[in-house]
Swiss-Prot record:
This is DNA polymerase subunit gamma-1, mitochondrial. Its EC number is 2.7.7.7, 3.1.11.-. GO terms for biological process: DNA replication proofreading; DNA-templated DNA replication; mitochondrial DNA replication; sperm individualization; sperm mitochondrion organization. As the catalytic component of the DNA polymerase gamma complex is involved in the replication of mitochondrial DNA (mtDNA). Has both 5'-3' DNA polymerase and a highly mispair-specific 3'-5' exonuclease activity. At the end of mtDNA replication DNA ends are ligated to produce a closed circular mtDNA molecule, its exonuclease activity is required for formation of these ligatable ends by preventing DNA synthesis from continuing past the 5'-end of downstream DNA into duplex DNA regions. The gene is PolG1.
């Protein structure tokens, strides 16, 4: 049975396919003046004939490389191409692009291995097919197996693997399963840690079960590491390979599972340094490829409401990702029962023992369900993703491996101790502010405080018992009491206080005389005496506001925080906001300290002129400024009413109007939430607002409050560790004993430290766009001096004798989008303004895309970069407005709208309509605006689509790109441009004009993002072809790719990375009809060869938990950053075809 449908592409595409785009000019930018423009160098080594450039002055790859990569497409220039180039150059000049401004780069000469095919496209198909063939041979029998072997009636309860005879169910102990292709499921008893307790597997021949020794030997405690001391907290479990499941280490193996990365993390051989060849097929990832959903659709699937008619089509084509839902979608039948799982989640090991047979049957039923899903789902996947590189890339992504050593435990310990120290300091500062605020109770001074006026200042009195009515007892002075006369005098003086002890009530109030809000911050003193021993989990009691923290509602008030100068205030229904006065007098104001508010932030001029009651009724909705929380939702536009427009001129900050008035004297405006105006802010000291302090948008209104600045600094430092601590500390690290370590780890020169590994639980295709997902490592930030624990990635450290080699793909998505526009509109690299700026633009002279956009609109380059990428991903003008106001809160809504409109007119252009041919006789054949087209269609009583062709973008630097993206996205079966993968069925279903526009932003985003996934999969295939088994895949996140390789092979691996980039981009341009590649994108700017996982090999990763950096704190030296020329030199020459393993292949 053949599942891969191979599409043949012509090596040369007809020129008629690429129609020239007409571009309307909105403004002319003066070309940047180039001073001392360098001359094109003649390559000393290769000679002047190696240099090549195209008709728009974009430097192309060296001639020797072109001959090897595009052997059937010799370079030649026709008269028609020269004539077209004049048009392209004129358009580039009109958009302010100086094609003479780019500086050439040195040519590169390389002898590449021979292509495995007639051209680069056949080459990648053939090498990908070679890589997946061993696994397809194991996978296809499972897919074609209509009936699994009969499940055993009784499962053997003994340690290790047991095989069951398919005829009579006889149990036979085995070291590991005998077959290499398995459907597999693991169960874990959560209360006992992350190690597996039982597992089941099935092949086409027999069933297997595995039982942990903890289950059979009643050993309840998690084993501690004995061979090497990790020097760690004894409360945290540590795992060795003895607790994991062995699968064998010889030859290729295939494991199928649902969310199989969870099961993989419990397999013994996956933690060994050498790759075993076992790969994993995840039915959840296959489901995401075939029937994945947007975030909006996922919310609809979770909703219990009756779906709208327009949603019924895609609801039938998709589901949530759980095994139960996926099985229901593809297999139907009875719903799977998941009740036994509760014992694993909530129960104990003893309960698992008591229900061993039923729980093992539950595990086996999940295996059977996974197999049924595989039989239906894999043929769908193979049909929709025909290129073998897609499957090869998924298999490689599922083998991620992160080596660690004892420094991992040191990192966790240092980060946690620093976090606790900073927490104590923040608590101290807040406690001091709380104690100082209590003094406002005197003479009701709190009524004049702008932040604490609405807190509960009620106090409790200490009521003493009535003294008994009896005669005082005579005092008898003992001569030998030992007290001095002075002591006796003081005792007599204060005796009345000692006597009042008997008058205290049995149940004494907490802190009598203190306000209620303060008492809530304090703990009651314990009933135990001070000399009694505390329990292990009991904290010692301390007086004062010991329960206060930055996460409490009182904290922003104690710090006197302001937003844009206005005091913060909290309303239960609206969350955090701030007060803006609209009256200049305090008459009739009951509670609010109006005089102090007016002194702190005077009433705006507009309010002084019209301080009427009607002002409070004028509500306006700030222009949402966001495409949608999720691109799959329909966009809703709301016009501003006259009252709303009036209010917009009154307040020009970034607050969100919510029609709330306090004491008939001031407006309450909500703080802006990152998810939109319908959300409320729960804590202005959270990570989302920390940057606002640096911008002085959030600040303390009390100039004397030094504590506020320090608490804010501490909050900024703690946010990363607070949000990621549980995931980081919960990583399943498996430590290797000395017998499992290669000789390089245990030599005389090696330090006696522990070595282990983490198998990150990567979902190979976790999103609609097929991006991989993993909650810790794929979201890890780069280290920052003010971010506690952000050195996380650098704690992945290569063992002795190994190096981590990798690179960051430069502007991957931007290049993909621009080259699609170049090929579609011109058939020439860099012939569109966006294409030229991407390929030859330079940040240093301001000719790159982000610099030109920033200069034209009047914003910073960094902000322009974010908005540019958001636009390419499909976001609209409203989203750009929100970003502009988020970056610069001083922008008014009208200013942000004007800048966004200007940006979109310059970049995206104007949307125009062209008449269909049958209307040329009665109407002028020209470009019509949306309004004109709609009016003409209505006049003829026809739909827009009947009178006009699909609209196009015109006149912008990115018009050609968006026209091509929309053409792909609006097709009946959208496919990725490189590997031909299809869009999810959930977005293909019921594609009509309305549905098409509804999901268009998501579809455009899918074209770019899913194209980037194709690019990654091709890189993985190429690196495996060039380096074979000499590299082990570590991780890919964002646009970065990292491998583990032996130190002596690291220069060759670095050169292989450069060649991988060259060949992958060559394949991509060939698939869209271009037969050449620009030199600027042919190779990585640098490949990092390092001992730790960090973005740049020179980063020292200084953080609050690592103040001395890696060099001094850990003794880790900087790595090497190799250009292609340096990699060639260190690899021993430019003839890659002579590498030993390549010659043998």
């Amino acid at each position: 049975m053949q599942f891969h449908l191979i599409r043949k592409y012509a090596s040369k595409v007809s020129r008629e396919h690429y129609a020239s785009s007409s571009v309307k000019i909105f403004r002319r930018v003066k070309p940047p003046q180039k001073v001392n423009k360098p001359k094109k160098p003649e390559n000393v080594e290769n000679g002047p004939t190696e240099y090549a450039e195209n008709l728009v002055k974009v430097q192309m790859i060296s001639r020797n490389l072109h001959a090897q990569l595009f052997p059937q497409a010799p370079r030649s220039i026709s008269e028609q191409q020269v004539a077209s180039a004049k048009v392209y150059k004129d358009e580039l000049r009109r958009h302010g692009v100086d094609i003479e401004s780019s500086a050439p780069v040195s040519d590169v000469q390389l002898k590449l291995p021979a292509l495995r095919g007639a051209n680069i496209e056949e080459h990648f198909h053939n090498i990908a097919k070679e890589q997946v063939q061993p696994y397809e041979e194991l996978l296809l029998p499972l897919v074609q197996c209509e009936q699994l072997p009969k499940r055993p009636k009784r499962w053997a309860f003994h340690t290790g693997w047991t095989a069951y005879d398919p005829e009579d169910g006889t149990a036979t102990p085995v070291d590991h399963p005998l077959e290499k292709g398995l459907v597999f499921d693991v169960e874990v008893c959560v209360s006992e840690g992350q190690a597996p307790v039982l597992a089941t597997a099935v092949s086409t021949k027999r069933w297997y079960s595995w039982v942990s020794s903890k289950l059979t030997k009643h050993r309840l405690s998690v084993e501690k590491l004995e061979p090497l001391d990790v020097d760690t907290d004894s409360e945290r479990p540590h795992y060795t390979t003895d607790e994991l499941i062995p699968l064998g280490t010889t030859g290729p193996g295939l494991v199928v599972g649902h969310n199989v990365s969870y099961d993989r993390a419990r397999l013994k051989e996956q933690y060994l340094t050498e790759d075993t060849g076992t790969r994993f097929v995840d039915t959840m990832s296959l489901h995401m490829c075939v029937s994945g959903v947007t975030s909006y659709q996922r919310a609809m699937l979770k909703s219990k409401k009756e779906p709208a008619a327009e949603d019924l089509g895609w609801l039938e084509q998709s589901s949530l990702n759980s095994l139960v839902e996926v099985h229901r979608l593809y297999c139907g039948g009875d719903t799977l029962s998941k009740e036994p799982r509760n014992i694993f989640v909530e129960g104990t090991l003893e309960q698992v023992r008591q229900s061993f047979q039923s729980l093992t049957n539950y595990c086996a039923s999940d295996v059977e369900a996974t197999h049924r899903i595989l039989r239906v789902l894999y043929p769908l996947y193979a049909e929709r993703f025909p290129h073998p590189a897609s499957l090869a890339g998924m298999l490689e992504m599922g083998s991620a491996y992160l080596p660690v050593n004892s420094n991992w435990e040191r990192y966790i310990r240092e980060a946690q101790l620093t976090y606790e120290d900073l927490s104590i300091e923040a608590k101290y500062h807040l406690g001091r502010r709380a104690e100082e605020a209590c003094s406002l109770l005197l003479d009701d001074q709190y009524r004049q405080n702008l932040w604490l006026w609405d807190e509960d200042w009620s106090v409790q009195e200490l009521k003493l018992k009535q003294p008994p009515k009896r005669k005082p007892l005579p005092t008898v002075e003992l001569k030998d009491s030992g007290n001095t006369p002075e002591e006796r005098r003081l005792q007599a003086k204060f005796q009345h206080l000692y006597d009042q002890q008997a008058l205290l009530p049995a149940r004494r109030p907490l802190l009598p005389g203190y306000p209620l809000w303060y008492r809530k911050l304090c703990r009651k003193p314990p009933a135990k005496r001070a000399d009694e021993i505390l329990e292990d989990d009991e904290e010692p009691w301390s007086p004062g506001a010991s329960e206060i923290s930055t996460g409490m509602q009182i904290a922003p008030k104690l710090l006197s925080l302001c937003w844009e100068g206005y005091p913060l205030h909290y309303e239960r229904e609206q969350g955090w906001g701030f007060l803006v006065p609209f009256r200049s007098d305090s008459e009739g104001v009951d509670r609010l300290p109006m005089e102090q508010l007016l002194a702190h932030c005077p009433v705006p001029e507009f309010a002084r002129l019209s301080a009427s009651k009607a002002e409070s009724d004028m509500a306006f909705d700030m222009l949402p400024g966001q495409v949608e929380q999720h691109l799959g939702k329909r966009e809703h536009y709301k016009k501003l009413s006259q009252k709303q427009q009036r209010l917009e001129t009154q307040y020009q900050g970034s607050g969100v109007w919510c029609n709330k008035v306090l004491d008939d004297c001031c407006f309450f405006l909500k703080l802006p939430h990152k998810n939109g105006p319908s959300f409320r802010v729960g804590n202005p000291l959270s990570k989302d607002f920390l940057n606002k302090f640096a911008e002085n948008v959030l600040s303390s209104g009390d100039p004397s409050c030094q504590a506020a600045a320090r608490v804010i600094d501490i909050a900024r430092m703690m946010s990363y560790w607070r949000n990621n601590r549980d995931r980081i500390m919960g990583q399943m690290v498996v430590w290797l004993d000395s017998q499992q370590l290669p000789n390089e780890f245990t030599g005389e020169k090696c330090q006696p430290i522990a070595y282990g590994a983490i198998c990150p639980q990567v979902v190979a295709c976790g999103t609609l766009t097929r991006r991989a997902m993993e909650p810790t490592w794929m979201t890890a930030s780069n280290s920052r001096p003010d971010r506690l624990g952000s050195e996380l990635r650098s704690m992945v450290q290569a063992p002795p004798g190994y190096r981590l080699v990798g690179a960051d793909v430069d502007s991957q998505e931007l290049w993909i989008a621009s080259v699609l526009g170049d090929a579609y509109a011109c058939g020439e690299h860099g012939a569109t303004p966006l294409g030229w700026m991407t390929l030859s633009g330079s940040k240093s002279n301001g000719s790159d895309m982000h610099s030109i956009t920033a200069k034209a609109v009047g914003i910073s380059r960094d902000h322009a970069k974010v908005i540019n990428y958001a636009r390419i991903y499909g976001a609209g003008q409203l989203f750009a407005e929100t970003l502009l106001r988020q970056f610069n809160p001083t922008f008014s809504a009208s200013e942000a709208k004007a800048k966004a409109m200007k940006m979109f007119s310059i970049t995206k252009g104007k949307r125009v309509y062209r008449l269909r041919e049958e209307f040329h006789d009665e109407l002028e054949d020209r470009a019509y605006s949306s309004y004109e087209a709609s009016r003409l269609a209505i006049q003829r009583n026809r739909t827009l689509a009947e009178v006009f062709h699909r609209p196009n973008w015109q006149g912008g630097t990115e018009s050609a790109m968006f026209n091509r993206l929309e053409e792909i996205a609006t097709g009946s079966q959208p496919r990725t441009p490189f590997l031909g993968g299809r869009l999810s069925r959930a977005l293909e279903a019921d594609t009509g004009p309305e549905q098409e526009q509804r999901f268009l932003p998501t579809r455009i985003n899918w074209v770019v993002q899913s194209g980037a996934v194709d690019f990654l999969h091709l890189m993985l295939v190429s690196m495996r072809w060039l380096m074979g088994s000499h590299v082990r895949f570590c991780l890919s996140f964002h646009d970065e790719l990292r491998y583990l390789v032996k130190e002596e092979l690291s220069p060759k691996a670095a050169l292989a990375m450069h060649i991988t980039n060259l060949m992958t981009r060559s394949f991509c341009v060939s698939r869209i009809g271009l037969q050449d590649l620009p030199m600027s994108v042919a190779f990585f700017s640098s490949v990092e060869v390092d001992t730790v996982l960090r973005k740049e090999c020179t980063m020292d990763c200084k953080t609050p938990s690592n103040p001395h950096g890696l060099r001094i704190g850990y003794g880790i030296q900087p790595g090497q950053s190799l250009s292609v020329a340096e990699a060639i030199e260190k690899a021993g020459g430019n003839d890659v075809s002579q590498w030993d393993w390549i010659k043998k292949s």
